UniProtKB/Swiss-Prot annotation:
Catalytic reactions on record: (E)-cinnamate + reduced [NADPH--hemoprotein reductase] + O2 = (E)-4-coumarate + oxidized [NADPH--hemoprotein reductase] + H2O + H(+)
Intervals of motif Nuclear localization signal 2: 247-254
Organism: Petunia hybrida
Protein name as catalogued: Trans-cinnamate 4-monooxygenase C4H2
Species lineage: Eukaryota, Viridiplantae, Streptophyta, Embryophyta, Tracheophyta
Enzyme Commission identifier(s): 1.14.14.91
Length: 505
C-alpha cells in the first residue's frame, strides 16, 4: 500500500473513532440493547471476537451472555439467537419484520446486489422470484418427474465404484463421484443435461469456478473489511478476484447452458405436452417481462450453490457417521433387506417405508447441520425481540445447530443416535414443526430445497448401504470427522478415503 493511501486511512480512522464514540453514546441512551461483550469505538467487538463467527464460537458466547446477545462488529450489529422461543419469534411470529437478508461486500458481488432469490431483501422482488422458482423446482410434481433420474444417477455411482479396484481394498474418496452425481441431479432439473464423467471438460471448469465461488464467499477472511469500512481498501485485491470469478461463472452459465437451451427451443418444435425443464419456465417468465436476463443467471447461480453443495455436504456427513457407527449401518441395512428384500434397490417411494433410514437422515441433519446458522436474517426497521431493542438493519443469526445440540433440550446431543427419533423425539420432523430442530429453517425464508434434498439423501444413503459395507481405510478404526465452518456452512474438513466392500445377494 502506498504512503498516501496509508495516510488517508489513518486520518479516516481517527475521524471515524470520534464519530463512532459520539454516536455510540447517543444510541446507548436511546436503545435497550441485548447483552454482549463491551465494544470499543470503530472496531466494536471485532478485536475480541475476530473474524471466525462459526456456530461453536457463537455457542460459547451464548453460554456467557444468554440466548439473545449482541456483537458489534465494526459498523454492523450481529444479534445471535440461541433458544427455540426466540427462534420462533424471528422466523415465525415476527417473520415479516425479520424477513430480509443482510448484505455484505462479497455477496453483493455474487448476487448482483440481491438480484437473486436467496439473498434478496424481503419484498416484491423476493415474492416474484419465489413464485417463479417454485413450479420448476420445489413441488412434488418435480420430485416425481425426476426421481427416476436420481435413481439412475446413484445406480451409476454404485456400478462405477464396483469397477474401481481400489474401492474395496485401500479405499477411495467417494465424494468425487458423488459430486458428479449431485451436479447431474440438479442439471437434469435445470437444463435437462448431464455430464458423462468427472473428466468432462465443461464439468471440470464448472466445478472449479463453483468451488472458487464457495471458497471466496464462505471464507471469514474478508469480514474485517466488511465490518469496518475504513479497512475496506485492504480488500481491493480480494474483491477484484470475486468480480472476476463472478463474471466467468455467469458467462459460462449463459454461453453453455441458458443460450444452448434457447437454441434448442428455437430449432425444434417443442411439444406443448412435453415435460419442461426448469430453465424453460424461467425463460418464459423472462419473455413475459417478469424478470430480466440477469435475474435468470442469478437463479442459476443460486441453484449451483444452494442446491448442489449443501446436499452433498449432508450426504458426506451421513456416510461418515455410518462408517464410524457400524452397528447403525448394519441396522439400516437389515431394515432395507427386510422391508424390500435383499438386492431390491431402494427407490424414492421406498424411502417412506423405511423409518430407520428416515431417522438416520434426521440425525445426520441434527448433529451435522449443513447450514448451522441458517441464512442470516435482517430487520429493515427498528424492532423488538426478547424485551430488547434491535436496531434497524441488524444481522440476525439463528444458531440452529445449538438449538439442535443443546443438552438442555436434547438427551446426549453429542451422540449420533437415530433411535432418538423413535423414542423421545418421535414427533420431530425436518420441516420445522419443532423449533429445536430447524435444518431447513422455517417460515417465509425457509429453504424450499427440502423437497429435493430429503429424497435425494434417502435414495443415495439407502443404495450405498444396501450395496456395500462402508468401512474406514486399512489401519484406521474411524474416519476423521473434524468440522470446517464457513460464513454459514458446515462441512467435513477432510474428504475421507473409505472402503466399499460390495455385497453379494
Amino acid at each position: 500500500m502506498d504512503l498516501l493511501l496509508l495516510e488517508k486511512t489513518l486520518i479516516g480512522l481517527f475521524i471515524a473513532i470520534i464519530i463512532a464514540t459520539i454516536v455510540s453514546k447517543l444510541r446507548s441512551k436511546r436503545f435497550k440493547l441485548p447483552p454482549g461483550p463491551i465494544p470499543v469505538p470503530v472496531f466494536g467487538n471485532w478485536l475480541q471476537v475476530g473474524d471466525d463467527l462459526n456456530h461453536r464460537n457463537l455457542t460459547e458466547y451464548a453460554k456467557k451472555f444468554g440466548d439473545l446477545f449482541l456483537l458489534r462488529m465494526g459498523q454492523r450489529n450481529l444479534v445471535v439467537v440461541s433458544s427455540p422461543d426466540l427462534a420462533k419469534e424471528v422466523l415465525h411470529t415476527q417473520g415479516v419484520e425479520f424477513g430480509s437478508r443482510t448484505r455484505n461486500v462479497v455477496f453483493d458481488i455474487f448476487t448482483g446486489k440481491g438480484q437473486d432469490m436467496v439473498f434478496t431483501v424481503y419484498g416484491e422482488h423476493w415474492r416474484k422470484m419465489r413464485r417463479i422458482m417454485t413450479v420448476p423446482f420445489f413441488t412434488n410434481k418435480v420430485v416425481q418427474q425426476y426421481r427416476g433420474g436420481w435413481e439412475y444417477e446413484v445406480e451409476s455411482v454404485v456400478e462405477d465404484v464396483k469397477k474401481m479396484k481400489e474401492s474395496n481394498t485401500n479405499g477411495i474418496v467417494l465424494r468425487k463421484r458423488l459430486q458428479l452425481m449431485m451436479y447431474n441431479n440438479m442439471f437434469r432439473i435445470m437444463f435437462d443435461r448431464r455430464f458423462e464423467s468427472e473428466d468432462d471438460p465443461l464439468f471440470v471448469k464448472l466445478k472449479a469456478l463453483n468451488g472458487e465461488r464457495s471458497r471466496l464467499a464462505q471464507s471469514f477472511e474478508y469480514n474485517y473489511g466488511d465490518f469496518i469500512p475504513i479497512l475496506r481498501p485492504f480488500l481491493r485485491g480480494y474483491l477484484k478476484i470475486c468480480k472476476e470469478v463472478k463474471e466467468k461463472r455467469l458467462k459460462l452459465f449463459k454461453d453453455y447452458f441458458v443460450d444452448e437451451r434457447k437454441k434448442l427451443a428455437n430449432t425444434k418444435s417443442m411439444d406443448s405436452n412435453a415435460l419442461k425443464c426448469a430453465i424453460d419456465h424461467i425463460l418464459e417468465a423472462q419473455q413475459k417481462g417478469e424478470i430480466n436476463e440477469d435475474n435468470v443467471l442469478y437463479i442459476v447461480e443460486n441453484i449451483n450453490v444452494a442446491a448442489i453443495e449443501t446436499t452433498l455436504w449432508s450426504i458426506e456427513w451421513g456416510i461418515a457417521e455410518l462408517v464410524n457407527h457400524p452397528h447403525i449401518q448394519k441396522k439400516l441395512r437389515d431394515e432395507i433387506d427386510t422391508v424390500l428384500g435383499p438386492g431390491v434397490q431402494v427407490t424414492e417411494p421406498d424411502t417412506h417405508k423405511l423409518p430407520y433410514l428416515q431417522a438416520v437422515i434426521k440425525e445426520t441433519l441434527r448433529l451435522r447441520m449443513a447450514i448451522p446458522l441458517l441464512v442470516p436474517h435482517m430487520n429493515l426497521h427498528e424492532a423488538k425481540l426478547g424485551g430488547y431493542d434491535i436496531p434497524a438493519e441488524s444481522k440476525i443469526l439463528v444458531n440452529a445447530w445449538w438449538l439442535a445440540n443443546n443438552p438442555a433440550h436434547w438427551k446426549n446431543p453429542e451422540e449420533f443416535r437415530p433411535e432418538r427419533f423413535f423414542e423421545e423425539e418421535k414427533h420431530v420432523e425436518a420441516n420445522g414443526n419443532d423449533f429445536r430442530y430447524l435444518p431447513f429453517g422455517v417460515g417465509r425464508r425457509s429453504c424450499p430445497g427440502i423437497i429435493l434434498a430429503l429424497p435425494i439423501l434417502g435414495i443415495t444413503l439407502g443404495r450405498l448401504v444396501q450395496n456395500f459395507e462402508l468401512l474406514p481405510p486399512p489401519g484406521q478404526s474411524k474416519i476423521d470427522t473434524t468440522e470446517k465452518g464457513g460464513q454459514f456452512s458446515l462441512h467435513i474438513l477432510k474428504h475421507s478415503t473409505i472402503v466399499l466392500k460390495p455385497r453379494s445377494f
